[in-house]
Design a protein with these regions (language model features):
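P-loop NTPase catalytic core
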Residues: 1-160
Length: 160
């Protein structure tokens, strides 16, 4: 099962508005209890053991960042580091119609060593270091061309 949530920030704001508060207000006007249900919801994503029916629950959620709202910053910081992957979108790339429009430097997967063989992981690190040396637009354009020119991840990484 996959749940798409747009956005975890708005969900937390809604709970902050409708839940009975504790009277303890965090920075940005967020009540300290407002994050309990959104955190429990987000924390429910997991692989379910075969003895309990198997399967998994994946949650793909957006979070608002750089909005100028202190509350949004507090909410984001509460969830930051709890997911397996963070993809930060890049407005500059989107404005230029370069897709996928994500910031390569700040996006990534935690525990990527579980996704790649050791030789692949070394090449992924090499790829990231090379992309970090390029401006975002040039890096994404180069990566898109390389992906289009190869048939699979091994071919892409072997070509580095």
């Amino acid at each position: 099962v996959v749940i798409l949530l747009d956005s975890i920030t708005r969900m937390a704001r809604a709970y902050n508005t409708v839940e009975r508060g504790t009277g303890r207000t965090m920075s940005g006007g967020l009540d300290s209890s407002a994050m309990q249900k959104p955190k429990a919801f987000f924390g429910s994503a997991r692989m379910i053991a075969p003895q309990h029916g198997g399967g998994s629950l994946s949650i793909i959620a957006t979070a608002l960042v750089e909005t100028g709202s202190r509350m949004d910053e507090v909410i984001f910081e509460e969830f930051k580091g709890t997911g397996n992957c963070e993809i930060k979108l890049d407005r500059g790339l989107a404005d230029r119609r370069i897709y996928p429009a994500f910031d390569i430097a700040t996006s990534g997967t935690r525990r990527e060593e579980k996704l790649y063989r050791p030789d692949q992981l070394d090449k992924v690190h090499l790829l990231r270091r090379g992309l970090h040396q390029l401006p975002p637009q040039a890096g994404m354009e180069w990566l898109i061309k390389r992906i289009a020119a190869t048939s699979n991840n091994d071919s892409l990484l072997d070509g580095l």
